[in-house]
Amino acid sequence: MIKVRVPATSANLGPGFDSLGIALNIYNEYEFGLEENKGLFFEGVEEEFQNEDNIIFMAIKKVFDKYDFKFKGIRIKIIKQDIPISRGLGSSSSCIVAGLIGAFALMGREINREEILSLAVEIEGHPDNVCPAIFGGLVSTIMVDNKKPLYNSVEFKDGINFIALIPNFKLSTEKARAVLPKEVPFRDCIYNIGRAALLISCFSNGNYDLLREATKDRIHERFRSKLIDNFDEVYNKSLEFGAFSCFLSGAGPTLMAIVDNKDINFVKSFTKFMEDKKINWDIKELKIDKHGAKILKGE
């Protein structure tokens, strides 16, 4: 059996729509094995997803088909599922990356992360979640001719934590995409380009006092925020309680606050605020995962 662990991810990072992503230290773990009996065998997977349309199986089959690898049956087990589903934290990317890595391992082939990225983008459609899930850390990504993904890892200074403010409801990527405008004003493009460049420099040199301005966005957040109850109140309170910045994680509905890693009051203050307002959201204090997806050995 092959065990694979994949981190959560937060994409967009304010102005970096479909281009910036970061890996975070909550994980899903998966186990894969070949079976002598023909068929698909699932464990830890909801019944409605126990079929050939399962995204994990689709990723595995993509690799097997590419290399003409023949198999009778396959076992897919979710050992641990700590990444919340449809919350803007890369749960689907985790499944895709795990399936691809698991497939290479089952074939006994070397894990080529560049190839895994290309295959993952063919499935996902964009690289900003799958790329940090594969490589870890903070990455800047683009698509060349809508086919080939290019990426560069961004060095960052320590000193910050990421606080995921996770609503108790799901928001599908399809619904979140549907509210976006078909065209964006030129001035809004300039607004985001400048802040995306500033954001990368803030992470690189540790000038986190500029993050509040550097994570602002005019391309997607104001449209998607209308789908999220309590968005404005939670966003404003996070800044009031001392966060460097707050932004929508991925397509939402999770909001991500960045705080000083020495700040011991933010989570306490926010927890009390949520309780007082009866806002039933989860709060997770996270750090950057620097390693990305990996095969677990000897566990």
Task: Name each region found by the language model.
Residues M1-R87, A105, R109-I111, K290-H291, ...:
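ATP-binding N-lobe of GHMP and related small-molecule kinases
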Residues S10-N12, G21-L24, D68-K70, G88, ...:
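Solvent-exposed alpha-helices and their adjacent loops that cap or buttress functional pockets
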Residues K38-F41, T173, K262-S269:
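Short, conserved charged micro-motifs
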Residues L34, M143, P167, A257-N261:
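Short beta-strand-to-loop capping motifs
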Residues F203-E299:
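Glycine-rich, charge-dense phosphate/pyrophosphate-binding loop(s)
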Residues R113-D158, C246, G252:
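Alpha/beta catalytic cores of group-transfer enzymes, especially the acyltransferase/condensing modules
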Residues I166-K226:
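Active-site rim beta-loop-alpha module in soluble metabolic enzymes
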Residues I26, L89-R113, I134-V139:
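DPxDG-like acidic metal-binding loop motif
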